[in-house]
From Swiss-Prot:
Biological processes per GO annotation: carbohydrate metabolic process; peptidoglycan biosynthetic process; UDP-N-acetylglucosamine biosynthetic process
Lineage, opening ranks: Bacteria, Bacillati, Cyanobacteriota, Cyanophyceae, Oscillatoriophycideae
Entry's EC annotation: 5.4.2.10
Catalytic activity: alpha-D-glucosamine 1-phosphate = D-glucosamine 6-phosphate
This protein's name: Phosphoglucosamine mutase
CDD domains (UniProt xref): GlmM
Gene Ontology terms: cellular component: cytosol
Organism the protein comes from: Gloeothece citriformis (strain PCC 7424)
């Protein structure tokens, strides 16, 4: 069964589905891996290998079945995308799968991931899909799913989608035809709702007039919305990488490459700069001297503000295992609590719901504040950081100097292309021995974290220590072991 798209007399895109013997041919050439498809942020990989049009088509059909069976009420699916060259193709294919299952699709085009999450929660939609690989390079892409509450699919629902997909492909069975085809609508006007809530999340007595702010938009999903909302609040905005560009998204720019932002902030005499990733669900900042302000600092500043306003239950912040020990100790010295989770904003979100925490996030810049939404939002976080600086009457650099001294922390990545070897790295005995040696040597003055990336073919090695020399030594030792036995 193959679904084609066509426009009717009203210009709406509808689907036509017919049986064919060729369904799944592309997937037969690129079989699904034995390891789980869903990582820490949906399905992600290199386009043309794991991700292709055939997989997106089948995935859309299977996701439609699961969502229709589990969401409280039927409704449309909202689809947004970033600027990658492959995003149009994957959007079209997954739309065909959804509409062939009888689900209506609202396509909103280029937008940040948090926009899809917000609209899934605040319209009659039964879910949302974002086509993006976040901070990954241009040749990658990904598919993120949200439920009707704007939350990423639970592990249970994601597993149901994956199980149905595997059964469909492995049995090479034909899908049962829907009694009626779903329709497709272009609903870009919905983005205005998201823009309005961004502006309304800032206190009405705060404006950014007189502040000069540099925005690194990473050639990605934030290029239209971020400048618009900062300007609407009175800021003087200087934009870098401010056009959608599928060839250059995240390339030497954005939240993973801050050099150009640091230079621009100093060159233009800006108060601060912020850098988004390709889908704008995370943000990092730099102060007027070009010093990096990561997610730990943002959590600390925002936590202080909410604590002073009595809006932070139990003075609790949820962070991940990557959070710096210097941040944790400083927050505890203020009477705060910090709970760590595994890496991934989905884990942070789950712990926030479980504990009733209102603030959580990651060092990498995914920040969630339940006072303003249920998902990490880079643009919203950047707005609040700028507002906090304005309200404080001090510079961002002064706030950093008065906060905490981070422990020396070194993070290195080793590329491991073999998916099964990467996912089963804990079975590597020499690496486990090396980790134990490093941790024993540093004792309670440092820590080691080794993990497989949930979004890229990497083994990540992090060593943190009071002593920079010790951190450097053990990082190099562990990297050598990973390269020898896994790479």
């Amino acid at each position: 069964m193959v679904t084609s798209l066509y426009r009717n007399g009203n210009g709406r895109l509808n689907s036509y589905t017919q049986d064919t013997a060729n369904l799944g041919v592309v997937n037969q050439l690129c079989p699904l891996p034995k390891t789980p498809l869903f990582g820490t942020d949906g399905i992600r990989g290199k386009v043309g290998e794991l991700l292709n049009a055939s997989l997106a088509l089948d995935l859309g059909f299977c996701a439609a079945q699961v969502l229709k069976a589990t969401m409280p009420t039927p409704g449309p699916i909202i689809i947004g995308q970033d600027s990658r060259n492959s995003s149009d193709m994957l959007t079209t294919a997954i739309t065909a799968g959804l509409t062939s299952a009888g689900v209506e699709v609202w396509q909103i085009g280029l937008c940040p991931t948090p926009c899809v999450a917000y609209l899934a929660r605040n319209t009659e939609a039964m879910g949302g899909i974002m086509i993006s690989a976040s901070h990954n390079p241009p040749e990658d892409n990904g598919i993120k799913f949200f439920d009707h509450q704007g939350l990423k699919l639970s592990k249970g629902l994601a597993q149901q989608v994956e199980d149905l997909l595997r059964n469909t492909l492995e049995s090479n069975s034909q899908r049962e035809s829907s009694l009626s085809w779903g329709k497709y609508y272009h609903r870009r006007e919905l983005i205005e709702q998201y823009l309005q809530q961004l502006s309304l999340s800032i206190p009405t007595d705060v404006n950014l007039e007189g502040m000069r702010i540099v925005l690194d938009l990473a050639w990605g999903a934030a290029v239209e919305i971020a400048p618009q909302v900062f300007k609407s609040l009175g800021a003087e905005v200087i934009c870098l990488h401010d056009q959608p560009d599928g060839d250059r998204i995240n390339v030497n720019c954005g939240s993973t490459h801050l050099n150009l932002l640091q230079q621009a902030v100093k060159e233009f005499g800006a108060d601060l700069g912020v850098a988004f990733d390709g889908d704008a669900d995370r943000v990092l900042a730099v102060d007027s001297e070009g010093r990096v302000v990561d997610g730990d600092y943002i959590l600390y500043f925002w936590g202080q503000t909410l604590k002073a306003q009595d809006k932070l239950p139990n003075n609790l912040i949820i962070a991940t295992v990557m959070a710096n020990l210097g941040f944790e100790k400083a927050w505890q010295n203020l009477g705060g609590q910090l709970i760590r989770t595994a890496v991934g904003d989905q884990h942070v979100q789950a712990q926030m719901w479980e504990t009733g925490a209102m603030l959580g996030g990651e060092q990498s810049g995914h920040i969630i504040c339940h006072h303003h939404g249920v998902s990490g939002d880079g643009i919203q976080t950047a707005l609040h950081l700028a507002a906090l600086v304005r309200q404080s009457g001090r510079s961002l650099g002064a706030l950093v100097e008065q906060s905490f001294q981070p422990y020396p922390q070194i993070l290195r990545n080793v590329r491991v292309e073999d998916r099964e070897r990467r996912c089963n790295w804990k079975d590597c005995n020499p690496l486990q021995i090396a980790i134990a040696e490093a941790q024993a040597a540093m004792g309670d003055r440092g820590r080691v974290l080794v993990r497989a990336s949930g979004t890229e073919p990497l083994i990540r090695v992090m060593v943190e220590s009071e002593c920079a020399q010790s951190a450097n030594y053990w990082t190099e030792h562990l990297i050598g072991v990973v390269q020898k036995y896994l790479a």
